[in-house]
C-alpha cells in the first residue's frame, strides 16, 4: 500500500482443470445445499467451475422462486440465460454484449449494452457496476435507474464486485426492491 492504493498483487494459481466440480457432488450435495439457502451466488473468476451446464443445474435445483445470481467473468460460450441477477462491471458487460471497445472505459453505450445483454441472456435483473460512476439497474433490457456513488476514501478495491453481488443478493432474497438493494 502506498498513499492508500494497492501497488502490487501477486496471484499464484494452479491449472483450471483442478477446479471442476465432481459430477457426484453436483448430483448429491448441490440440491440439498441450494434447498437450504435463500439464494444462490455463482462466481468463479473464470476458473472453469461455473459452466453453462452447472448454471442450468443450479437453476433447476433452485426452481423459479429462488434467486440465482451471477458475478460473471466473460468466457466464450458461457450461457446464463434466465438468471435472476447478473452483476458485471462495465468492462465485463461490454465483453458479454460482444461490443467493440470492450475492456476500455472510453466507449460505453449503456442502453445498447443493456439491450444486448437482455437479448442474449434474458436476465431478469442486470446491475452494472461503473466504479466511481455508480451503478445501472436494468430490467427487460431497459435502464431503470442510474445510482451515483457517494465519494469515499477507498483503500483497496479488490473484491468490490463480489461485495456488490453478495449485498444485492442478500437484500433481494430478504425482499428488498432492486432500487432499495442498490
Where are these predicted regions, by residue range?
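Short, charged, surface-exposed secondary-structure boundary motifs
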Residues: 19, 95-98, 154-158
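Buried hydrophobic positions in well-ordered alpha/beta secondary-structure cores of metabolic enzymes
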Residues: 37-43, 135, 161, 168, ...
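Active-site donor-binding loop signature of nucleotide-sugar glycosyltransferases
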Residues: 12, 88, 149-150
Amino acid at each position: 500500500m502506498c498513499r492508500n492504493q494497492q501497488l502490487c498483487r501477486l496471484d499464484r494459481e494452479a491449472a483450471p482443470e483442478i477446479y471442476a466440480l465432481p459430477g457426484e457432488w453436483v448430483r448429491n450435495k448441490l440440491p440439498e445445499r441450494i434447498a437450504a439457502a435463500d439464494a444462490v451466488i455463482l462466481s468463479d473468476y473464470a476458473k472453469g467451475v461455473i459452466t453453462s451446464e452447472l448454471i442450468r443445474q443450479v437453476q433447476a435445483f433452485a426452481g423459479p422462486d429462488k434467486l440465482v445470481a451471477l458475478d460473471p467473468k466473460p468466457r466464450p460460450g458461457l450461457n446464463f440465460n434466465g438468471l435472476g441477477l447478473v452483476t458485471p462491471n462495465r468492462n465485463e458487460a461490454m465483453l458479454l454484449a460482444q461490443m467493440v471497445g470492450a475492456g476500455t472505459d472510453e466507449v460505453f453505450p449503456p442502453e445498447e449494452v443493456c439491450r444486448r445483454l437482455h437479448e442474449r441472456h434474458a436476465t431478469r435483473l442486470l446491475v452494472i457496476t461503473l466504479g466511481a460512476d455508480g451503478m445501472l439497474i436494468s430490467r427487460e433490457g431497459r435502464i431503470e435507474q442510474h445510482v451515483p456513488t457517494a465519494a469515499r476514501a477507498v483503500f483497496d478495491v479488490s473484491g468490490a464486485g463480489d461485495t456488490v453481488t453478495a449485498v444485492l443478493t442478500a437484500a433481494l432474497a430478504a425482499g428488498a426492491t432492486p432500487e432499495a438493494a442498490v
